[in-house]
């Protein structure tokens, strides 16, 4: 089964059965002479889905902005949820919401700009998305192109007019899986694996399907492998030489036995972190504070855990009849 993270209604899945059958063009290379880091403070953009009678799909998505310095949470708006899984991004550059939406039979899911509650289509070459993140004057996405299979790392300019495939795989076998930003270095850290190896590992509990951790420099568009592990990665964050991983042995049931590790990227040595949380999803690291989607006891939500003081803040708790789909650290 294709490993795209979805929280989706049967109606939406039916709509998307033919979403990726259209014609596509190669993604054009991006032309950016410099990529100065946006001076705005890093922030979280959060997506939370809910049932909506106003939407054709019966669901909608809320987009939230969280100021990590002021520790203030604000809902920025709502959009229809028609894509395979809800994905929103609040941009501090134009005070607008970007979101993924179903574009029509054979046309896949595309990125739209919510412009006075109307959707302005910004892309036409994609099929699906796992991530959309603001990185200074650019956007990073983990996306699937029309007529392709795997999720790739893609960098787009501020208007989505020029995009580049920064880690092209001729075999179309490499999945870009977990993603996080490294704002102070203007970089993206992400894990990737071979889909064929992962399928084989699913057949044998604890089977070997190595994951590689790569660092993408958004200024040069160059990638570098910084770490490798035999484990399945279900969470990643990085700052400086500190890499935080949520991982587990491969296999359908053994993946539930995940643990959190801190890796020194200079020495490649790892130590297990025993945190009072259950983390098995998106993470981010900034000023030695670990932001993550997980559980504290029976309460699922987004938390901020200070790795130095061991204190934590609750950013958002899940509420009845709504589901926190994910977040991203943007700048």
What function would you assign to each model-found segment?
Residues 68-71, 114-119, 157-161, 217-221, ...:
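Short loop/turn segments that connect beta-strands within beta-propeller blades
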Residues 44-58, 145, 190-208, 248-255:
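Short, conserved, GDST-rich strand-edge loop motifs in beta-rich repeat architectures
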Residues 73-80, 121-127, 163-169, 224-228, ...:
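Beta-propeller fold detector
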Residues 44-48, 99-100, 140-143, 189-192, ...:
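Residue position within the beta-strands of beta-propeller blades
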Residues 30-37, 82-93, 125-137, 173-183, ...:
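Repeated scaffold domains used in trafficking and secretory/extracellular systems
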Residues 24-73:
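An edge-strand/N-cap motif at the start of beta-rich repeat modules
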Residues 301-303, 308-331:
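Blade-level signature of beta-propeller repeat domains, shared across WD40, Kelch, NHL, RCC1
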Residues 16-19:
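C-terminal motif of bacterial Sec signal peptides marking the signal peptidase cleavage site
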